[in-house]
Curated annotation (Swiss-Prot):
InterPro entries: NA-bd_OB-fold, Primosome_PriB/ssb, ssDNA-bd. It comes from Rickettsia conorii (strain ATCC VR-613 / Malish 7). This is Single-stranded DNA-binding protein. One of its GO terms (biological process) is DNA replication. HAMAP family: SSB (MF_00984). The keyword Mitochondrion does not apply. Residues 125-144 have a biased composition (Basic and acidic residues). Residues 5-111 form the SSB domain. A motif (Important for interaction with partner proteins) lies at residues 147-152. Residues 54-60 bind DNA.
């Protein structure tokens, strides 16, 4: 198998209102925290257990930034597809720090609003990246193009 794949798919809830910042060039970037919760039944005690994992999400895609600005708030349920990236920086004391983030920045990125409160306010595709390949869009099929006669 040639090449490699870096793809993250998450379904979870936004932990706090998304934070928007603007670069020096005027490009908008959104940061948000997404919680995913795993539940299971303990084999010994039969208790229901759960563990929540928090994910840092950074959105560079203009189309997705626009959707998040308008519709996403604390508690919103999202489906996201992006890639995993680790960033390095130096803190105020010069110490190297690292953070790993789910990044949505290219045509392979997706964000879908799963809340019923949000889905009534816009059409289903408004949450998808505008950078998707045209062949991945939904196309309706017109049955009138088919011949009525069976060829055998």
């Amino acid at each position: 198998m040639a090449g490699s794949l870096n793809k993250v798919i998450l379904i979870g809830n936004v932990g706090r209102d998304p934070e928007m910042r603007t670069t020096g060039e005027g490009k908008k970037i959104i940061n948000l925290s997404l919680a995913t919760t795993e539940t299971w039944k303990d084999r010994i005690t039969s208790e229901r257990k759960e563990r929540t994992e928090w994910h840092r999400v950074v959105i560079f895609s203009e189309g997705l930034v626009s959707v998040v600005e308008r519709y996403v708030t604390k508690g919103s349920k999202l489906y996201i597809e992006g890639s995993l990236q680790t960033r390095k920086w130096n803190d105020n004391s010069g110490q190297e720090k690292y953070t790993t983030e789910v990044v949505l920045q290219n045509f392979n990125s997706q964000l879908i609003l799963l809340d019923s409160k949000n889905s009534n306010n816009h059409n289903q595709d408004s949450g998808h990246s505008e950078y998707k390949h045209p062949e991945t869009k939904n196309h309706s099929f017109d049955h009138s193009d088919l011949d009525d006669e069976i060829p055998f």
